[in-house]
């Protein structure tokens, strides 16, 4: 079924069932709750659809509607309303006066948006953003909350029954060159089926589906859109939404919402699990039980085994089942999901010899191993999405334990980037494997840019190709380096290299977190941290650190999905724009 036909079916068969709930915390009048049933949602969607159909009635091409609005139910109605009208929706962040505003403006320009959908609250900021960053000042900006509900049914259902119906998902990478991934409704429905098959235990031949969804992830993000919109729509369960800001201000809200709703499904990046552990008190959890939680995905950034261990230990007293926590791997170029752990099994990890990993192949650590790297174990089988390890230079498939680029094949994979050069799209999305193993299609394959290896039905991720740090001819993975540094600094870390006359130099930038704040710590304390970090990297990794920066909490640049952007860190470092807490002798 298509997205819109599914919505129409929900509105017809279960019109009074709760569909979407938005928890708006910390407003001037206190916490507010906005609720919609399936029939109410369908009415709001058709209001948006009616406006867009009328606006684009004489168009000779498919129209595009960018959505740049606050997190909430208007965002949901805007996205679905554009699909319902046969338009191409483009989910984007709300302008908040930050660096990501440039990305929003450039994306509006890149997708040639015919209209921008927002709310009355954000309309002025949206107009200023698209005018400042190159989009036409004449692009109509429509406040979703001002549209009247029409009489009758305006959804162009037929437009939803083919692969042609699509949306653009802009990736959360560089702000200088935002790339819109073209995703069809077929891509989405395939990925939803893959998620249902791989995340939920099957009992009596049927999946044990969640009874609710809890999400604070931004709806403009690939994982936020899947968890906060597509999953509840196709499963037919209510979703409780709140904003990323509400979570950051009080991380305990996430655990509280999970405890208060029936068999919930949820997801978040790795850093959110660390925050939940550090910022959720016994008082916050008093009287709450997590024993009924269906699934919590840890994804969207590299999953750290220590984080999983600490999270399970912290919430074990509240009956959280280990098998409910699902480390996951995915990317926008394949809607979102690519791999997770085996259904019904708790998350596990394996220790490998770090020196062997640096040489390009995996060997289990032993009692004689000097340096070990612990990696999350994912499950790999012969069902789509297929995953193979390939030499990125020769395109030859690599054998068990050999580290290479992760390539993906499946019906959930996009056909390419919007407005991209044909050669780029062919190389990225239509790659061919040479000397493929039995049962492996020759093409088309998606090059992920990630490095990993396969052993049997186990799959491991070691890092990003572009972030690889090479020193003295040896490969070093930044995630491994950053894990070591965090043991001393406590905050988020970026390990990256800078080039000087063709020589690569390692730079470490670490957010310092102390009990009294960075302004209360002496230079002596900082010098001690630096000495310990430099010594550990030398002894454990054989690395020489050219520069070590301690920066205030929150100072490291991030992508729109909340991941530390190593490329942006390197760029700011080169321009001397990274704010230092202290300068070392």
From Swiss-Prot:
It is an enzyme of class 6 (ligase). It comes from the Bacteria. Coiled coil: none annotated. The keyword Lipid metabolism applies. Pathway: Lipid metabolism; fatty acid biosynthesis. InterPro entries: AMP-bd_C (IPR025110), AMP-bd_C_sf (IPR045851), AMP-dep_synth/lig_dom (IPR000873), ANL_N_sf (IPR042099), FAAL/FAAC (IPR040097). Keywords: ATP-binding, Fatty acid metabolism, Ligase, Lipid metabolism, Nucleotide-binding. Its EC number is 6.2.1.-. One of its GO terms (biological process) is lipid biosynthetic process. Belongs to the ATP-dependent AMP-binding enzyme family. PANTHER family: DISCO-INTERACTING PROTEIN 2, DISCO-INTERACTING PROTEIN 2 DIP2 -RELATED. Catalyzes the activation of long-chain fatty acids as acyl-adenylates (acyl-AMP), which are then transferred to a multifunctional polyketide synthase (PKS) for further chain extension. This is Probable long-chain-fatty-acid--AMP ligase FadD30. The gene is fadD30.
